Amino acid sequence: MKTLIVSGGNVGKEILNKTIKNNNFNNIIAVDKGLEILDECKIQPNYIIGDFDSVNQKIISKYNEERTIKLNPEKDFTDTHMAIKLAIEKKSDYIVVLGGIGTRIDHTIANVHILKECIENKIRCEIIN
């Protein structure tokens, strides 16, 4: 199973559309602000996860709460880390993360570090910036 995780970093329409076109994703997970670019491109995520501190509330209100996972803003992990855990739980064997690097150094370091969790679970994972 292939999963695309769209995080809150800088993701352009071109790279998003190219990544989707070149892969046959079974699941798309929007992470907090990552929902905005998916919404702009009219791409429906299967899951939305985050503490929703950075996404436009008008956008998130358009989506089904049934597939929305709201996280506590006071936590010891990033929203993207929880998206990786969700992808692993859904039996993904290939995970692509868009927008996981660049905007915040603490999140960049954490997101690179969570690749270890994929390796430990024998899951192919890549971060595309």
Give residue ranges: language-model regions:
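N-terminal beta-strand-loop-alpha-helix module at the start
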Residues: 1-62
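Hydrophobic anchor at the start of a short beta-strand
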Residues: 45-46, 95, 125
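Short phosphate-binding loop-to-helix
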Residues: 68-90
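Short glycine-rich or small-residue beta-strand-to-loop segments that form or flank ligand, phosphate
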Residues: 69, 95-100
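Short Gly/Thr/Asp-enriched flexible loops that form oxyanion-binding sites at enzyme active sites
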Residues: 106-116
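Class I SAM-dependent methyltransferase SAM-binding "motif I" and its flanking Rossmann-like core
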Residues: 116-129
